[in-house]
Amino acid sequence: MQFNRKEYLKDVKNIVVKVGSSTLTYENGLLNLFHIEHLVRQLVDLHNRGYNVILVSSGAIGAGVGKLGLSEKPKSIPEKQAAAAVGQGILLHTYEKIFAEYGKTIGQILLTKEDMIDEVRSCNATNTFNALLDKRVIPIINENDAVVVDEIKVGDNDTLSAFVSKLVKADLLILMSDIEGLYSCDPRINNDAELINFVEKITKDIISCAGGAGTDLGTGGMATKIKAAKIATSAGIPMLIVNGATNEVLQDVVEGKSVGTWFNAIK
C-alpha cells in the first residue's frame, strides 16, 4: 500500500524542527537574518495552526565566530566553547526579538547527552518540555556547547533533535538542511543523482547514499541525518529531510506535499 503523507499528518500535534548552521549563518559566521526571519515566520504559522513546535537550533558557535572576528571555526575545545558562550546569547536574542514581533514566547533549553540517557534527568527534561508546551511556549534547544566535553557530548544537532523527539513524543521530526533531501549519490558532483522521496527502511543501500561532511561551521552531514533517522524511526517517529532555503517549505510539509525525503517510522 502506498504511503499517504497527507493522511498521516492529520493526527500530527508535536513537531520537532532542526535547523543547521548552514541555514542560519553565512560562511563568515555572521547570522543570516533573512533565513532566520523566514524560518521564524514559518514556525509561527505552524504554531498558529495549533501545532506544538520545538526548534533545535544550531548556529551558536558560528555566531560566536562572527562576533569574535575569527577567520574560521576554532579547533581547540576551550576556543569552541568560548565561541559557543558568546554566540548562544546572540542567537537566542535574535530569536526572541523576531518571535516577539509575532506575539510568541520562547524558552531556551540547553541539553547534554546525560540529559538523554540518565533516567531521572530525561524525565525532568520531559516534564520541562511538557510544561512549556502546555503554556504554548516554543522551546528552542541546543547542546550546551559552552560546558560539555567530548566524553558526554551528543556531537551534532541532527542526533540531538532525534533524542529530543523521543523526549517530547514527537509525531514528526523535520531536519532543515542545505540540500533537498537524500539523493542516490552526491548531487554536488554527480548530475545523475536522483532525490529519494520515501524511505521505508534504512538499509545498507540507503546508508551508502549518505556521505561527506557538513559545512565548516557545522558538524553534520548526510551521515548524521541517517543516524538521526535511525533513532527517530525506531522510536516510532517519522523523519523528513527538506531544504531549509526553500520558500515556505514547512507549510508544504504540513499540507502533505511531496517535498524532501520521508523516512517512515518503524511500527
From Swiss-Prot:
UniProt enzyme class: transferase
Pathway linked to the protein: Amino-acid biosynthesis; L-proline biosynthesis; L-glutamate 5-semialdehyde from L-glutamate: step 1/2
Q: Which residues bind substrate?
A: 58, 145, 157
The protein's location, in the record's own words, is: Cytoplasm
Listed GO biological process terms: L-proline biosynthetic process
* Gene3D superfamilies documented for this protein: Acetylglutamate kinase-like (3.40.1160.10)
Any one of the GO CC terms:
cytosol
One of the entry's Gene Ontology molecular-function terms is:
ATP binding
Query: PROSITE patterns from the entry?
Result: GLUTAMATE_5_KINASE (PS00902)
Q: What is its main location?
A: cytoplasm
Alphabetically list the UniProt keywords.
Answer: Amino-acid biosynthesis, ATP-binding, Cytoplasm, Kinase, Nucleotide-binding, Proline biosynthesis, Transferase
Pfam families from the UniProt entry: AA_kinase
Catalytic activity, reaction form:
L-glutamate + ATP = L-glutamyl 5-phosphate + ADP
Presence of keyword Zinc-finger:
no
Recorded superkingdom: Bacteria
User: What Enzyme Commission number(s) apply to this enzyme?
Assistant: 2.7.2.11
Q: Which residues bind ATP?
A: 18, 177-178, 219-225
Belongs to which family?
A: Belongs to the glutamate 5-kinase family.
NCBIfam families, per database record: proB (TIGR01027)
Q: What does this protein do?
A: Catalyzes the transfer of a phosphate group to glutamate to form L-glutamate 5-phosphate.
Protein name (record): Glutamate 5-kinase
Organism annotation = Clostridium tetani (strain Massachusetts / E88)
- Protein's gene: proB
